[in-house]
Amino acid sequence: MDNGIFIVVTIFIVNILYVTIYTVRLLLTMKGYRYLAALSSVFEMIIYVVALSLVLDNLNNIANVLAYAVGFGVGIIVGMKIEERIALGYITVNVITKEYNLDLPNQIRDLGYGVTSWLASGRDGERMMLEILTQRKNERKLYKHIIEIDNGAFIVSSEPKQIHGGFWVKQVRK
């Protein structure tokens, strides 16, 4: 392989690695994993210095700069995909049912989720409001279960900043 092509490919790969670690570290920091974020930042900086020095030592070739920039963009996507797979943290899922159904909370509880429910008033009558706290990795599965039970449900999820007390199950049933 030509030395110029080797440098371009190396810059591209090293920058993907750097930005992937950077993205995951940033997400770890936001989720409160301080020590893991700090440890990953050590590797992030080592890789960053290597990538930047490769580009700065070879600024005469525009392909090196482009490889750095494209590697940066690809690294963000890869980092986000990794974080989606890891799915750290919890989500609060709020559900407004299409119709008032007293059995719905128990159906969801039977799947292993903790549910708080109450009567709500909608434009077209009584609804049931549910609040469910679950691990992010269970979000899609929970949505699927809710839609199977009540296809017309309105579902919104958000990430809580802090959690204290409440009902927890050891494992959500498959």
Curated annotation (Swiss-Prot):
Cellular localisation: Cell membrane
Keywords tagged on the record: Cell membrane, Membrane, Transmembrane, Transmembrane helix
UniProt xrefs under Pfam families: DUF2179 (PF10035), DUF5698 (PF18955)
InterPro entries in the cross-refs: DUF2179 (IPR019264), DUF5698 (IPR044035), UPF0316 (IPR022930)
Keyword Nucleus among record annotations: no
GO cellular component, one term: plasma membrane
Residue spans crossing the bilayer: 4-24, 36-56, 62-82
NCBIfam families referenced in this protein's UniProt entry, alphabetically: PRK04164.1-3, PRK04164.1-5
Record-given protein name: UPF0316 protein lmo1776
